[in-house]
């Protein structure tokens, strides 16, 4: 769905049609609900970054009343996540829905942070890859800028606690596993997932698709934290080696896609070296009854010198008569201005 700009004294972004109401949106097909949400959220994001005005959408359901039915839980969540501090005013005029946005300025006269749907900047939090919110992303990038980059390895604590020692032990076990050249089907492995270790089984014909889905955020998170290991072909539930069969995905094909994916990840530098993402990918043969039956894909990602994004930040503005996505350079400049 295209977003059009209406020629009026006030900036109006027309987001097309939308189904509104808490119950009505719950009964929608998931694909349609996501697409409508994405489109009107994109329009709102662009408007917030372009001053003031209105987002306009034609209401699909004819019996809708804003004061009675609400707008929809998914829309409320998405709108709040763009820029929580920005007040919004919802209005209905006949069969049209309006989101009114007033120009916002900080007390110091600056325009504040860019409204953003997704920073696409990840870090590790425990055993998970977590997207940074605007505040965390700003703090992370400013620290790197002040320091002129990040050291190749994290400085250890003077007195590491039990959690730090446990994570170090897990990483040592994962490093030893990474060095293996031969594995045995159904054999147990002795390390858990942690800040530096993640593993997946992906026993499916859609292995390549699943890897491509998780790889950007996992690599971004490891690179932006302290590096780490991703293993494909390990059963999370039973902590057993299962591997993946070559018929589901040839190792060379998977390796090529991993390389392509990592090289396409956006990065930003505040250092002089401007290095590329450092990683190593290998395939360990899995044996059963003496014969090779599957493979484990082992990926080691090094701590990055600056910042790695899973994708360009999803943030929009009105430019040259249309709704345009900020480049990563524009977004960072806006965020840190």
Mark where each language-model region is.
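Conserved N-terminal catalytic/coupling substructures associated with nucleotide/phosphate chemistry
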Residues: 1-337
């Amino acid at each position: 769905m295209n977003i059009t700009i209406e020629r009026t004294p006030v900036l109006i972004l027309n987001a097309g049609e939308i189904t509104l109401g808490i119950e009505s949106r719950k009964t929608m097909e998931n694909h349609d609900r996501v697409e409508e949400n994405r489109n009107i959220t994109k329009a709102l994001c662009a408007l917030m970054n372009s001053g003031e005005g209105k987002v306009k959408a034609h209401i699909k359901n004819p019996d809708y009343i804003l004061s009675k039915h609400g707008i929809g839980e998914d829309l409320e969540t998405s709108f709040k996540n763009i820029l929580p501090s920005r007040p919004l005013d919802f209005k209905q005029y006949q069969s049209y829905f309006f989101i009114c946005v007033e120009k916002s300025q900080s007390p110091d006269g600056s325009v504040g942070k860019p409204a953003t749907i997704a920073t696409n900047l990840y870090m590790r939090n425990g055993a998970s890859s977590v997207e940074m919110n605007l505040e965390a992303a700003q703090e992370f990038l400013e620290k790197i800028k002040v320091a002129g980059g990040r050291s190749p390895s994290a400085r250890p604590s003077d007195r590491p606690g039990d959690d730090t020692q446990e994570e170090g032990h897990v990483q040592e076990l994962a490093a030893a596993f990474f060095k293996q050249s031969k594995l045995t089907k159904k054999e147990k492995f002795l390390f858990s997932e942690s800040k530096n270790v993640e593993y997946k089984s992906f026993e499916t014909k859609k292995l390549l698709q699943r890897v491509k889905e998780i790889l950007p955020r996992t690599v971004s998170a490891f690179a932006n934290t302290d590096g780490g290991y991703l293993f494909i072909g390990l059963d999370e539930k039973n902590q057993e080696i299962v591997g993946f069969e070559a018929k589901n995905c040839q190792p060379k094909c998977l390796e090529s896609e991993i390389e392509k994916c990592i090289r396409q990840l956006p990065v930003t530098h505040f250092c002089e070296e401007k290095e590329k993402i450092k990683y190593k990918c290998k395939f360990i043969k899995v044996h059963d009854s003496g014969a090779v039956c599957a493979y484990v894909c082992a990926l080691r990602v090094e701590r990055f010198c600056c910042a790695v994004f899973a994708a360009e930040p999803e943030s929009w503005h009105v430019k040259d008569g249309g709704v345009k996505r900020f480049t990563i350079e524009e977004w960072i400049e806006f965020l840190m201005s």
